UniProtKB/Swiss-Prot annotation:
Family according to the record: Belongs to the SPARC family.
Ranges for domain Kazal-like: 420-481
Compositionally skewed regions (Acidic residues) per UniProt: 89-99, 189-198, 205-214
Endpoints of the signal sequence: 1-16
Gene: Sparcl1
Claim: rRNA-binding is one of the keywords in the record: no
Native source organism of the sequence: Rattus norvegicus
Residues annotated to bind Ca(2+): 605, 607, 609, 611, 616
Name recorded for this polypeptide: SPARC-like protein 1
GO molecular function, one term: collagen binding
GO biological process, one term: signal transduction
Region (Disordered): 50-335, 360-398
Length: 634
């Protein structure tokens, strides 16, 4: 059934072709016929012979051309009757006939198009009418252009008759070749193998193109309009896609060579019946297939990227202009440059490089953009939680600046309140720096602390209690088991203490790199007198009786060492008063020698006010009150 419908459709189109070609000259005269024989007979057989040598499947083309010449005049007289019959068949077979014939049309169309690899540019002032509005019109366009170059000054009627014969020859050959094609080719491949040259192209003779439709009958005008719409629906999409791609690459020059480059590539694709993916690989257009709304975007881009030349009209105006009819279906090669084989190869490689550069990188760019968006979102998400820590860091920095010059007692630390004012609070023992074994300290409660920092921090936390008030640093190091100090030992303690202080000053005065610069000039002058005195008792483990006798004999040698020791302890603060904390260094150094030091300092504070003045200090060491002088504190 399909074969019968295809045959009827082909016969209907063959009958309608002369009507279309003879739109301007419905009644041929004797003047035009001789010109037709002289102008077209030598050209058509030569081109057909060249095509037959290159393409063996055109064997039936030559006898078809002879038969078409004999039937030319007979069909012209019956144009009105046969055209109405063709319109009816066209309406019935509109859905199936177009797609079934297209592969054969494209094969012959592209094979003949490649038989002439090099053509010259058609002059813009050449007066050629529009070609026939059938799907087979592009198969003879290269021949028509070649003929136009050889005889540009021929009358318009000659080119009409020439196109009439070539159109009929193509129709007969198409009818025979349609039965030889493989019917199993998918419709999708057929649509994609449509030649983009079928779409409407620019024309320099727009005024002449509008005249033939006015002379045709109304029924013929409508039939050709329907035929134009069917062809444009099938073939406009590939042309617009390729045009849009090349507009980004080459501008107006890319528009001139685009349709010819695609025709060269699609000819090889239609001969070998390549799959859809291979055709995309040859054309380098696979990047646009991923676009879902490519029809709308391609039409918009095709209109927006038109050249500004006044002599060139939009390439898709045939699809939008229903009044164009026959004239709107010129091949793209009517007014455009036909490039050479080398130019086509360069265009194809450029298109492939464009696809590899932009078509394949588009997904990567989208992924990179999405990844960049995700990274920005993650950074924002990370920055929001970090805002509060940064504020805390600023507050800490501000508090550090406020507490830099604010001093607190030992065991206390500085902290700012809500208004930024610094104040002292008890230090947490856990915040003390790590301590070594040598940093251990023994308190007056006979408890060993990791360091003095831990001891005073504990004392601060016990403030307000009796234990906290009594807790003091007893000496450095772990607490020892010290026997109780007797009254006799307490009485002997000042004697040993005076001798010990005198011996320390002698060591500091002697030339020693370790003690260099420890004593100032005034101190050295005082120590020098003691050091050079021959009656001085040298250091050693002397009995109490010897120590008591030397003190009475050389009293003046012990006055300055007692003042010097008080000045050394009175540092925090230097107020001429010794606190229990200021006595701690002396206590720690004396404990290994004397276990009565705690009781000794208790005896030195007769008023029990926890403070030892210079006079109280002198009295403990047996210095006379008149010899106690603050001027010796230097």
């Amino acid at each position: 059934m399909k074969a019968v419908l295809l045959l009827l459709y082909a016969l209907g189109i063959a009958a309608a072709v002369p009507t279309t070609f003879l739109s301007d000259h419905s009644n041929p005269t004797s003047a035009t016929l001789p010109t037709l024989e002289d102008a077209t007979v030598p050209t058509v057989p030569a081109e057909a012979a060249a095509d037959i040598e290159k393409h063996p499947n055109h064997k039936a083309e030559k006898p078809s051309a002879l038969n078409s010449e004999e039937e030319a005049h007979e069909q012209s007289t019956e144009q009105d009757k046969t055209y109405s019959f063709e319109v009816d068949l066209k309406d019935e077979e509109d859905g199936d006939g177009d797609l079934s014939v297209d592969p054969t049309e494209r094969t012959l169309d592209l094979q003949e198009g490649t038989s002439e690899p090099q053509q010259k540019r058609l002059p813009e002032n050449a007066d050629f009418p529009a070609t026939v509005s059938t799907p087979f019109v592009d198969s003879d366009q290269p021949a028509n252009i070649t003929k136009g170059e050889e005889s540009q000054e021929q009358p318009v009627s000659d080119s009409h008759q020439q196109q009439d014969e070539s159109g009929k020859q193509t129709q007969d050959s198409m009818t025979e070749e349609s039965h030889k094609q493989d019917p199993g080719i998918p419709n999708e491949e057929k649509e994609e193998e449509e030649d983009p040259e079928d779409v409407g192209a620019p024309s320099d003779n727009q005024e002449e193109e509008k005249e033939p439709p006015e002379e045709q009958p109304t029924s013929k005008w409508e039939g050709n309009g329907d035929q134009s719409e069917d062809i444009l629906q099938e073939s406009s999409q590939p042309t617009q896609i390729s045009k849009t791609k090349n507009d980004f690459e080459q501008g107006s020059q890319g528009q001139e060579g685009d349709s010819n480059a695609e025709g060269e590539d699609k000819a090889a694709g239609s001969k070998e019946h390549l799959p859809h993916t291979e055709w995309q690989g040859q054309e380098g257009r696979a990047g646009l297939d991923a676009i879902g709304n490519r029809k709308d975007t391609d039409e918009e881009k095709a209109v927006s990227t038109e050249p500004t030349d006044a002599a060139v009209v939009p390439r898709n105006h045939g699809a939008s202009d229903n009044g164009g009819g026959d004239d709107s279906k010129h091949g793209a090669s009517d007014d455009y440059f036909i490039p050479s084989q080398e130019f086509l190869e360069a265009e194809r490689m450029h298109s492939l490089s464009y696809y590899l550069k932009y078509g394949e990188e588009t997904p990567d760019e989208s992924e990179n953009r999405s990844e960049a968006g995700d990274n920005q979102g993650a950074k924002k998400a990370e920055s929001s939680p970090n805002a509060e820590p940064s504020d805390e860091g600023n507050s800490r920095g501000h508090s550090a600046d406020s507490c830099m010059n604010f001093q607190c007692k030992r065991g206390h630390t500085c902290k700012t309140d809500q208004h930024g004012k610094p104040h002292c609070v008890c230090q947490d023992p856990e915040t003390c720096p790590p301590a070594k074994i040598l940093d251990q300290a023994c308190g007056t409660d006979n408890q060993t602390y990791a360091s003095s920092c831990h001891l005073f921090a504990t004392k601060c936390m016990l403030e307000g209690t009796k234990k906290g008030h009594q807790l003091q640093l007893d000496y450095f190091g772990a607490c020892k088991s010290i026997p109780a100090c007797t009254d006799f030992e307490v009485a002997q303690f000042p004697l040993r203490m005076r001798d010990w202080l005198k011996n320390i000053l002698m060591q500091l005065y002697e030339p020693n790199p370790k003690h260099g610069g420890y004593l100032n000039e005034k101190q050295r002058s005082k120590v020098k007198k003691i050091y050079l005195d021959e009656k001085r008792l040298l250091a050693g483990d002397h009995p109490i009786e010897l120590l008591l006798r030397d003190f009475k004999k050389n009293y003046h040698m012990y006055v300055y060492p007692v003042h010097w020791q008080f000045n050394e302890l009175d540092q925090h603060p230097a107020d001429r008063i010794l606190t229990h904390s200021e006595l701690a260094p002396l206590r720690a150094s004396l404990v290994p020698m004397e276990h009565c030091i705690t009781r000794f300092f208790e005896e030195c504070d007769p008023n029990k006010d926890k403070h030892i003045t210079l006079k109280e200090w002198g009295h403990c060491f047996g210095i006379k009150e008149e010899d106690i002088d603050e001027n010796l504190l230097f």
